[in-house]
Amino acid sequence: MNKNVLKFMVFIMLLNIITPLFNKNEAFAARDISSTNVTDLTVSPSKIEDGGKTTVKMTFDDKNGKIQNGDMIKVAWPTSGTVKIEGYSKTVPLTVKGEQVGQAVITPDGATITFNDKVEKLSDVSGFAEFEVQGRNLTQTNTSDDKVATITSGNKSTNVTVHKSEAGTSSVFYYKTGDMLPEDTTHVRWFLNINNEKSYVSKDITIKDQIQGGQQLDLSTLNINVTGTHSNYYSGQSAITDFEKAFPGSKITVDNTKNTIDVTIPQGYGSYNSFSINYKTKITNEQQKEFVNNSQAWYQEHGKEEVNGKSFNHTVHNINANAGIEGTVKGELKVLKQDKDTKAPIANVKFKLSKKDGSVVKDNQKEIEIITDANGIANIKALPSGDYILKEIEAPRPYTFDKDKEYPFTMKDTDNQGYFTTIENAKAIEKTKDVSAQKVWEGTQKVKPTIYFKLYKQDDNQNTTPVDKAEIKKLEDGTTKVTWSNLPENDKNGKAIKYLVKEVNAQGEDTTPEGYTKKENGLVVTNTEKPIETTSISGEKVWDDKDNQDGKRPEKVSVNLLANGEKVKTLDVTSETNWKYEFKDLPKYDEGKKIEYTVTEDHVKDYTTDINGTTITNKYTPGETSATVTKNWDDNNNQDGKRPTEIKVELYQDGKATGKTAILNESNNWTHTWTGLDEKAKGQQVKYTVEELTKVKGYTTHVDNNDMGNLIVTNKYTPETTSISGEKVWDDKDNQDGKRPEKVSVNLLADGEKVKTLDVTSETNWKYEFKDLPKYDEGKKIEYTVTEDHVKDYTTDINGTTITNKYTPGETSATVTKNWDDNNNQDGKRPTEIKVELYQDGKATGKTAILNESNNWTHTWTGLDEKAKGQQVKYTVEELTKVKGYTTHVDNNDMGNLIVTNKYTPETTSISGEKVWDDKDNQDGKRPEKVSVNLLANGEKVKTLDVTSETNWKYEFKDLPKYDEGKKIEYTVTEDHVKDYTTDINGTTITNKYTPGETSATVTKNWDDNNNQDGKRPTEIKVELYQDGKATGKTAILNESNNWTHTWTGLDEKAKGQQVKYTVDELTKVNGYTTHVDNNDMGNLIVTNKYTPKKPNKPIYPEKPKDKTPPTKPDHSNKVKPTPPDKPSKVDKDDQPKDNKTKPENPLKELPKTGMKIITSWITWVFIGILGLYLILRKRFNS
């Protein structure tokens, strides 16, 4: 064989083998059509915080090139450097009416849309892809920093600014946070970050964690990272066991069924160590918008207040990704309806389709109606060939259309695609008007309640429906008219719209103010005051004078009626009414509070007075008389909380002290009567008066001693007032553009609730002052803040009471304030902070704010767009934090004064019991008509009830607060001393045993030490009973098991013919506490121990556990320090500890599985085979 022939044959063989391989590869080469087919690329928002999210939206169509099988559109972003973007892994199908024509794949490094062969059947293709990405600013700096990341698709690009906040100097002790990793969108990561500053703690640390719906705990992912004096890392199945061994006394309890984790760390190990417990939850509901995790903490940092069950909840929003495509298929009519000016799609436009010749269109219908969807698209498929007419028959207001215009088109059997058309509508210049509603009050009440108006419209059938997007208007006291602006005058048919209002509550629910009736008539609402609820006080005069034996009984007596201690009426009572009296038509309430009525009697000569309720008994005691004193408080119902719980008064005889004193308090209705007084001295009539012994700070005292039957001691206190002044500053180059308004409205908020508004003008040099404001509310200082109603073209900045308005045409600002309606956090349920988000025209902006005490629960967003698509933007807020037990109401009426109110009704309880008599059915007739039962809250007397046979000797204290500052109140009962009876108290059952000559005494211990905050309270104390000031040797131990109370029984009632007075003294000296003993009533002796917390000594560092082989500390050099709440930093997979002994089973398995490398490898072997064949043939040829 010729050598050249051999070479030629080998070449041909090689060419035949290789050529098909390369041709096959070229047949499936995909095109990147990003530059030709992408029409727009945007991000929203355009500025985010480090670790925050933004939404990328890319739109495309086929106007610049037909889209084919295998074509791709790519979106790229920076994946390294100081600023980078990470996508969240998602795959979203692209469908047309249920048929998939491609898919969008989002990865951490980019997004790609790939089309399949089904897209080639479509024409007029347009679509979009929308997905979230995370932005990171990795600049190594402690100062604030902005970095710009550019996202591209073909020749389109958009920028997002990633802001890194200034590093803080302090941290919170505990917070709960979470996130979703870009590469793992099927799980949520959660972090419990405990003792972040490695502080010394005074108590054990307890954390409770409850995973909410839509997710399930994956225990295999749990790991614990400890830094500090006992640094270590625990992960895997044995993480909890290893941790508990290393930290004796610690406990981590996991309940997979309930989705809960409970953590306890002893005080010793909790000090100087920081703990981060990290785990993942598997998402079980992919459609859920957000995932919530609730957590509570109990701890106490050294020198700080104890935290008991404070909530630390966190929400992670699900990752959103969406994509869509539109096109026409054969036999399909598709209409796109859009705004002529803005090109925005118009929904709810109705069209009528018919054949030109009037024949059936399809399905035996000669006319078919189609309506546009939210994307402005209306379509119908499978139309037979023929000539058609499309007519628009209805469009939403304010769009106009020509009812007579026809849109003809033709469908042919030879067509490969359907018919697509775009129809544009212009907005009509709509007639608008302002609608005003009026409030009419009929009645005498000076202070009117706050009510709300909701606007409705009425059709021809008298059906009423709420006006869409009309604000609920608030009418505070003094406001009688409200207006809605720019409302349409006519409906879509040109008929005038009839507007009317209804009276509602803040939530928009129908309501009527308490104490009023209402009448709604169009745009006028009239509230008529109901007749004032009245009561009557009746009683009788009883004479104990042997039927006026000595003829001393007067013809009449004067009975005085006192309302809350102040004399308001007097009646002369005579025998004509059988000595009975009645005060009628008395107001039952004063400013919503029930009036306490009592009676007294002007002094009756030769008689001693005894008052029992409204029964006044006069006993003929020649030579004796009585005197009655009443305390009257004039302090605006104790507004500032300065009123004492009791005061002491002394009786004077002709100006000289008698030594006879009395304690006046709520339990005796602030009144007392002295009996058995000498009527004369040295032949002269004695005048009895009173003086107040208790000096009440801040009060002035006036004593009315005119009538010793009605001595009145008035204590007057003028509540403290304050004023709030400030100024309006204009930053607008001295009103250069003439946009400054003539006035602005400044709102005053008291504890977050708007109470007053002032119009501020240039006449006062733009300064303002709210005067005569109450400084306190129920004893607690009021926190005043100011806001401002929105000022067009200006951005507002509030610093204290200085309000600066900067002229920023096209920009505006929004201010939010949190208002708590929870009785000053009585139950301790209020969180330390809440998170709110700003909305623009009903859509979330991603702009959030944390509201807490440090910023007075208020925040202002500045630099906001004033308009969007030529329309004024309305900014509102929504609360992101779900506060358990609270209802939320958001007042979005004015974006300069957005108010989020959280209302919580404190829990109440009741204490009921009964009085049992052990006296042989009152054999000796000594049983009193009534007894006084005292209610003690945590050892302190708070209420007293008179118990009688009318209630079968049963009693009940209702509507009692269940908690005080978040701690459950311990209620107990005692009883005022009952003569000739011994008292035994078992829970709330009070038994009185008739023991003539014997009595009893009850002592209760009251602790005033902030619920034993510093742990100094002893477990028990010892008290001793005293008889007339002398120790009896009778002692008692008081502790928790006996509710810190004890009763001595079988005590002598008299000694040497005189009534014995029993008192107590405390034998136990409690270090750091001061002791006060209230010995006023031996049925209710109270020993109070008060403790003022002191700063503890320098703590001793705990020793490290003496484990011989502690776990090896992993290398965390690459670990990112936890960021503050709501900014969880990404922890790379490489940061997790690895077992270096594990090797891959097969190194080849680690190689990328690409078709090109397989082909190259195969070609290499073909070459070797051919070369071998060539050498064999050549050898034979040569031989």
Swiss-Prot record:
The record marks 1066 as: Autocatalyzes isopeptide 1005-1089 formation. One of its GO terms (molecular function) is collagen binding. Composed of a N-terminal A-region and a number of B-repeats depending on the strain. At the C-terminal end are features required for surface targeting and covalently anchoring to the peptidoglycan. The collagen binding activity is located in the A-region. Keywords: Cell wall, Isopeptide bond, Peptidoglycan-anchor, Repeat, Secreted, Signal, Virulence. It holds the Pfam family Collagen_bind. InterPro entries: Adhesion_dom_sf (IPR008966), Collagen-bd_Cna-like_B-typ_dom (IPR008454), Collagen-bd_dom (IPR008456), Fibrogen-bd_dom1 (IPR011252), Ig-like_fold (IPR013783), LPXTG_anchor (IPR019931), SpaA_PFL_dom_1 (IPR041033). The record marks 788 as: Autocatalyzes isopeptide 728-805 formation. It is a peptidoglycan-anchor. This is Collagen adhesin. Residues 533-1093 are annotated as: 3 X 187 AA approximate tandem repeats. The record marks 692 as: Autocatalyzes isopeptide 631-715 formation. Residues 1074-1150 are annotated as: Disordered. The record marks 975 as: Autocatalyzes isopeptide 915-992 formation. The gene is cna. The record marks 601 as: Autocatalyzes isopeptide 541-618 formation. A motif (LPXTG sorting signal) lies at residues 1151-1155.
